[in-house]
Amino acid sequence: MISSEQAKQLYADRFEKDKKQSSKGGWHSDITFEPVPSDYAILRLTELPPTGGDTLWASGYEVYDRLSPAYQSFLESLTATYAQPIFNESAEKNGFQIYSAERGSPENVGSDLKAVHPVVRTNPVTGWKSIFAVGHHAKRINEVTEAESQHLLQWFVQLIVENHDLQVRYRWQNPNDVAIWDNRSVYHTATYDYDGVRTGQRAVSLGEKPYLDPESTSRREALEKAKSR
């Protein structure tokens, strides 16, 4: 369930700040801290605030395509650690435990909520590469220093927020609106500009363990080849 009221209870620290000066930390792909994370997600909001609360999505294909070939090759050699310690902290503060049995896959067990995946991932449906290590689940680029890791993770988000043409924004109109997206190559965030209640249901399916196919291509390369035929 997606609930603004539940979020205020579970993550009270988030809502106690006087002035909100940046919302870029909201960008993420769903449950990338699992060894087998989500492929598709479905979201329906059944209770909407009077104004605000839009959802934004951004293209991981396009983030990858905006990098130089040299940087693309460098990032393809890296892995990242994905984790969500805030969930465990919230569970401890609020007196419940993280579900530690199989969460949709035999590999998604335990309460650590931590996994290692490539920085650049191939989408098995399209065969295109995208930057995967984006958002608040991506904690550390493993093969570089801490300073270099933070620089890269912040830069990936910066590429999203400074390029509106790789984003799409949806204004929820009524309880029958449904959004479906592919977490393997798309990031999303809510827009926290509302005061009313925002409630809904989200379901995710599980895909495969993220991988990089060295024979895969970029979206831009694939479209250029299609044009030349």
PLM feature segments, named:
Residues M1-I180, R184-R229:
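Fe(II)/2-oxoglutarate oxygenase catalytic core
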